[in-house]
């Protein structure tokens, strides 16, 4: 799923490890999300949104949105 994770993380000056710690996931999990190799669970998507102070829709593209 297309997302803005790398951009949002870079804007804050965070490393993948920094974001992983905030989300309580591995750095490898953050990398897999940023490179769109894996999609987040619904719970993780909401945690990511909370960490960035944004709505889920502002971070992840909805493939079903026209």
Predicted features, each with a name:
Residues 16, 29-30, 52:
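A structural preference for long, well-packed, hydrophobic secondary-structure segments
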Residues 24, 43-58:
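DNA major-groove recognition helix of helix-turn-helix/homeodomain DNA-binding modules
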Residues 10, 24, 35, 64:
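Residue-level detection of the helix-turn-helix DNA-binding "recognition helix"
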Residues 58-66:
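Short amphipathic recognition helices of helix-turn-helix/homeodomain-type DNA-binding modules
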Residues 3-22:
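Short basic helix-loop element that most often maps to the first helix and adjoining turn
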Residues 25-39:
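Recognition helix of helix-turn-helix/homeodomain-like DNA-binding domains
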């Amino acid at each position: 799923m297309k997302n803005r994770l790398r951009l949002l993380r870079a804007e804050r000056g965070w490393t993948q490890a920094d974001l992983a710690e905030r989300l309580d996931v591995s750095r490898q999990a953050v990398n897999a999300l940023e490179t769109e190799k894996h999609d987040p669970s619904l719970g993780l998507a909401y945690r990511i949104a909370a960490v960035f102070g944004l709505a889920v829709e502002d971070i992840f593209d909805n493939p079903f949105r026209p």
